Curated annotation (Swiss-Prot):
Entries under NCBIfam families matching the protein: mnmE_trmE_thdF (TIGR00450), PRK05291.1-3 (NF003661), small_GTP (TIGR00231)
Subcellular location per the Swiss-Prot or TrEMBL entry: Cytoplasm
The protein's name in its UniProt record: tRNA modification GTPase MnmE
Function: Exhibits a very high intrinsic GTPase hydrolysis rate. Involved in the addition of a carboxymethylaminomethyl (cmnm) group at the wobble position (U34) of certain tRNAs, forming tRNA-cmnm(5)s(2)U34.
Highest taxon in the source lineage: Bacteria
Gene Ontology CC entries for this record: cytoplasm
Keyword field: Cytoplasm, GTP-binding, Hydrolase, Magnesium, Metal-binding, Nucleotide-binding, Potassium, tRNA processing
Binding positions for GTP per the UniProt entry: 231-236, 250-256, 275-278
Binding site for Mg(2+): 235, 256
Residues in coiled coil: none
Quaternary structure and interacting proteins, as annotated: Homodimer. Heterotetramer of two MnmE and two MnmG subunits.
Length: 442
């Protein structure tokens, strides 16, 4: 991808959904946008007003007739001259329009995320807002949408910029003490006040990092694993939760040999539920592999549902894992004893207990996520840089035996780490990673 600041090409791409569709939107950005209008529409429409025009190839043939909007620089998404062409969403129409645009000098198809990258390069957004937009596009549940909107609205940027300014101000006091210690207008030692302020900032960042775990769960989803002996009803429960036949149900033991996963939306929280191979001793090589995978998935789970057939002999055994485990008695319609052993009793034949279990799963997910604050770290990149910030702050606070010059340098490094989160300093090496997450038309 082009280096920041060297965007001389005009880029274009289909920014709407898959074809065919009712309407297709082609987006354009760059210095040749006005030339594109003059060539294809023989006119430049009034800025920010929809105009109904005929779009033509260079030889004058009509391609389509539709709406177009012109957004002159710098007041556009990318900060460059931008345009949108709204066409009928037929494949032939869109392909012809893209082909005509590609023939124009200085115009080329956009790379993934290039519109957003240009917006970043032109100061229209910082990296956290760009990441929030990527999450908003990828959001599949209401909770994910709300979290992405908080980030895309700039809440993170405001918080990190405020913290960075506090570090810069604190460093300025230390350097003033170094440079003007003999001047009368510099208070006596301000160091103690600075270290107290940095200690308070450190605690704020630590609390902020702790909230990131919940945000990560909301962004990436909670993981629930169903385990139990063969024929305990694991696949039947998965099919109920999925609302469709995902797993094969059979009286033959060992039918499920690999992991089967479905995604649920429980109160706006994404929850991934995995059915696993029945846990038992077996000589089957394939089944052993399935059991090993089941145990590996259990180790990564947020919650394990351990199922046992209530109608048979009671032999409840729970695998030793860190995740919270619920004992679920199945086939409740067939009766059984020792009902106090199980947290829930269910029957996929009659539906008994299933809605109660589903409600409990949603309550578990909501309790795990909790109340998401206005600004939370949503990427591991953020958390790593925040931890690096804390490390430098700690060095500054605890360096009583160090010269003030070195402690001021720790403060400078801390502010740099915060600046890397928003993209204010030294982030070129991660830009390709971030913007490659977008689709071509964004």
């Amino acid at each position: 991808m082009s280096e920041i600041g060297s965007y001389h090409d005009t880029i274009f791409a289909l920014s709407s959904g898959r074809l065919p569709s009712g309407v297709a939107v082609i987006r354009i950005s760059g210095p040749k946008t006005r030339f594109v209008y003059e060539t294809i529409c023989q006119a430049i429409p009034e800025p920010r007003h929809a105009a109904l025009l005929t779009f033509r190839s260079r030889n004058g043939d009509a391609i389509d007739r539709g709406l177009t909007l012109f957004f002159p620089a710098p007041h556009s998404f990318t900060g460059e001259d931008c345009a949108e062409f709204h066409l009928h969403g037929g494949k032939a129409v869109v392909e012809k329009m893209l082909a005509v645009l590609g023939e124009l000098p200085g115009c080329r198809i956009a790379e993934a995320g290039e519109f957003t990258r240009r917006a970043f390069a032109n100061g229209k957004m910082d990296l956290t807002i760009a990441e929030g937009l990527a999450d908003l596009i990828a959001a599949e549940t209401e909770g994910q949408r709300r979290l992405a909107m908080q980030v895309a609205s700039g809440n993170q940027r405001k918080l990190y910029s405020e913290w960075r300014q506090r570090l810069i101000n604190a460093r300025a006091f230390i350097e003033a003490e170094l440079d003007f210690a003999d001047e009368s207008d510099v208070p006596g030692s301000v160091s103690m006040q600075v270290w107290q302020q940095l200690s308070a900032l450190k605690h704020e960042i630590e609390h902020h990092i702790a909230s990131g775990k919940r945000a990560a769960m909301l962004r990436d989803g909670l993981h629930v694993v169903i385990v139990g002996a063969p024929n305990a009803g694991k696949s039947s429960l998965l099919n109920f939760l999925a609302g469709r036949d995902v797993a094969i149900i059979s009286k033959e033991a060992g039918t499920t040999r690999d992991l089967l996963e479905v995604k649920l939306d429980l109160g706006g929280i994404p929850v991934y539920v995995t059915d696993t191979a029945g846990l038992r001793e077996t000589d089957s090589v394939v089944e052993k592999i399935g059991i090993e995978r089941a145990r590996a998935r259990m180790a990564e789970a947020d919650l394990v549902l351990s199922l046992e057939d209530m109608s048979g002999p009671v032999s409840v055994t729970v695998e030793k894992i860190e995740a919270e485990t619920w004992l679920i008695g199945t086939k409740a319609d067939l009766g059984g004893s020792a009902s106090g052993l199980w947290k829930y009793h269910i029957s996929t034949m009659t539906g008994s207990g299933l809605e109660q279990l589903l409600d409990a799963l949603q309550a578990f997910a909501e309790a795990k996520i909790g109340q998401i604050e206005d600004a939370v770290p949503t990427r591991q990149r953020h958390i790593n840089l925040l931890r690096a910030t804390i490390e430098e702050i700690e060095k500054a606070i605890e360096g009583d035996d160090l010269p003030l010059e070195l402690r001021a340098e720790n403060m400078r490094l801390a502010s740099q780490f915060l600046g890397r989160i928003t993209g204010d300093v030294d982030v070129e090496e991660i830009l390709d990673v971030i913007f490659s997450q977008f689709c071509i038309g964004k």
